[in-house]
């Protein structure tokens, strides 16, 4: 990694940490530069402005090649086994960016320009799942059904559990992750199996 790339990475890491701590309004370019160990001129040379930094932070926190790759490697075309692995991978990924997701609900919705960037991850995951369900339908391993709708229902089920746990801890349910994942996947599979 070049020195320029290392500097960019430090700036983005500092920005994310400060955004979690102070929110968008409270995170100044001066604070970001200080935390990253550079001056504001360097920050502006790399990113131009605070908005661009925020956009790059968002890009780094969405469904990407790592999650897709780990799921792809574990697909065996067994509906229950695959959906369990997908749900587990999704929950683990969402937990890894939990602070960012909660910050998004608290702060980022106010910044209209970010909505397209923020929605890229969920849209990409929806497309990925839709393609998986289409292949399962082609193999006649699920009932004839609208696969995009199926993907959305699967995502919402898992996202709802994640948000409930992230926001309320065990107040809504003390159900362990493993019990939720197994139970919800079994129910889902029962509903779409031929």
Language model feature labels by segment:
Residues 1-22, 27-38, 52:
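Basic, helix-initiating cap at the start of DNA-binding domains
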Residues 18, 132, 187-194:
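C-terminal alpha-helix
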Residues 24-25, 114, 142:
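Conserved hydrophobic residue
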Residues 38-47:
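Short hydrophobic/aromatic patch on the recognition helix
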Residues 47, 105-111:
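Short helix-capping/turn signature of helix-turn-helix
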Residues 55-86, 133-134:
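Amphipathic alpha-helical linker/stalk segments
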Residues 58-59, 81-106, 155-159:
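Helical hydrophobic small-molecule/effector-binding pocket
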Residues 92-96, 113-139, 149-152, 163, ...:
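Amphipathic alpha-helical packing segments from all-alpha helical-bundle domains
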């Amino acid at each position: 990694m070049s020195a320029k790339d290392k500097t960019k990475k430090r700036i983005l890491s500092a920005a994310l940490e400060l955004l979690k701590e102070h929110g968008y309004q409270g995170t100044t370019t001066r604070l970001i530069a200080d935390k990253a160990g550079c001056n504001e001129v360097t920050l502006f040379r790399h990113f131009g402005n605070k908005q661009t930094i925020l956009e790059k932070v968002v890009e780094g926190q969405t469904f990407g090649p790592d999650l897709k790759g780990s799921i792809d490697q574990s697909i065996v075309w067994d509906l229950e086994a695959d959906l369990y692995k997908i749900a587990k991978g999704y929950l683990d990924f969402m937990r890894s960016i939990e602070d960012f997701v909660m910050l998004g609900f608290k702060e980022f919705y106010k910044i209209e320009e970010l909505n397209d960037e923020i929605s890229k991850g969920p849209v990409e995951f929806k497309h990925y799942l839709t393609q998986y369900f289409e292949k399962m339908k082609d193999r006649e391993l699920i009932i004839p059904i609208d696969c995009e709708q199926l993907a959305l229902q699967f995502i919402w089920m898992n996202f709802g559990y994640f948000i409930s746990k992230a926001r309320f801890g065990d107040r809504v349910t003390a159900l362990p992750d493993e019990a939720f994942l197994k139970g919800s996947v079994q129910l889902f599979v029962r509903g779409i199996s031929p």
